[in-house]
Amino acid sequence: MLDANLKTQLTAYLERVTRPIQINASIDDSAGSREMLDLLEELVLLSDKISLDIHRDDNQRKPSFALTTPGQDISLRFAGLPMGHEFTSLVLALLQVGGHPSKAAAELIEQVQHLEGDYQFETYFSLSCQNCPDVVQALNLAAVLNPRIKHVAIDGAWFQDEVQARQIMSVPTVYLNGELFDQGRMTLEQIVAKLDTNAAKRDAAKIAAKEAFDVLVVGGGPAGSAAAVYAARKGIRTGVAAERFGGQVLDTMSIENFISVPETEGPKMAAALEQHVRQYDVDIMNLQRAEQLIPAGADGLIEIKLANGASLKSKTVILSTGARWRQMNVPGEDQYKNKGVAYCPHCDGPLFKGKRVAVIGGGNSGVEAAIDLAGIVAHVTLVEFDDKLRADEVLQRKLRSLHNVRIITSAQTTEVLGDGQKVTGLVYKDRTGGDIQHIELEGVFVQIGLLPNTEFLRGTVALSPRGEIIVDDRGQTDVPGVFAAGDATTVPYKQIVIAMGEGSKAALSAFDHLIRTSAPATADSVAQAA
């Protein structure tokens, strides 16, 4: 199951283990149990610190296996086969159960260790989901750190009865003590913030006490990361306030056009961005959403008010708030979000195996989604508002070659239908004849572009009719000292490599602004100061 190269790498990782790892496997006579045992038996051969016990017990999930160590009360289990994107989760779990320290911040680790109460987490994932490992790894670490936290990571494809009973149509989906806890990508910081009700107040007080920055970057995507690095390299006080570090990149499956890196995945790039920024003296403030920008007053400081009630001040600000998936804004979309309405075909596609779905949008993203889904689902209907598809010709040719795809153009989606629990259909208007049409299906994947995260700037910073921040060729906005970069701006072509360049440029422009505004007004002023 593991090739020679992977075994060599894994053997090297397992040398970091400092205490015994006990694997307790719960199996039956299924082919899945045999497949899981093949993997576990290979792991045992890679380290003398790993042992395997096989049980034909009454565990509700078979095949599954738990990881523990003598003398420690750890409850961490994988149900299914953690390969694909989740293989890294398995490796990290082995290391952490085996005593290798986590790289999480010491303050966060202490917060997890002191959580009060009993928490039984269940995370449903799919092997093709790039968002799932973050959640699985966060909760696995929590289970290692705190004996009152238990976690089971469940491959939804292997436990379809549970998925259907709980009507799970989006991953990752997390249950806590039998009740729905949350869905979508979550960091350990975000999870702890939901469990520790006083965390937000403590965080706000800590932020409010910070001194003013020279450069404050709002947003932690490619543009914000580049801006932070370039600003910090100038030796000036730099801060980053971000709702989630990595931004939209975290939701990108495959990246093949970032020059010098032939192929990577969004979460890997996001992790690399944060690692690079942390090499410099940058104050990173995660889980922070900006709600208002107040231009500089008499003190020369721009103020950013945050959703938690705290405020940050800075001599200059770089706005790199990025963009989010654009919604259809039709009846039923919000009601059935994560109940059949989805925005990530890579994550949620496997949950619709054998079902009928629609993809809304005929650009590159929509056509790529339809092609990917066609290999999983029973049938795909692609719905495009325009009278023709806008995707690259090579993608259109591939799409039209698929036998289980129907293309509808000149169609305006008007409603998502459901039975109160899940999606059952879609309504669209034929824009050529005006007829109303219904499609029976179980899933709707929305791929109609991005919407800039700039609502909090309305009335303060000049925005285009599309809501993008208007910038000049130096990244300057119409507010002195406020710069902007990335997908939230009017700069054409929303690409990672372009966003990084724009972020770097904005930082250099901000530094130039600081020099010019702090310089003495006249030569006489310099002489007097001397």
UniProtKB/Swiss-Prot annotation:
NAD(+) binds at residues 356-370. Disulfide bonds join C344-C347. Keywords: Disulfide bond, FAD, Flavoprotein, NAD, NADP, Oxidoreductase, Redox-active center. Pfam families: Pyr_redox_2, Thioredoxin_3. Binds 1 FAD per subunit. FAD binds at residues 214-229, 477-487. Its cofactor is FAD. It comes from the Bacteria. Homodimer. Serves to protect the cell against DNA damage by alkyl hydroperoxides. It can use either NADH or NADPH as electron donor for direct reduction of redox dyes or of alkyl hydroperoxides when combined with the AhpC protein. This is Alkyl hydroperoxide reductase subunit F. It comes from Xanthomonas campestris pv. phaseoli. The gene is ahpF.
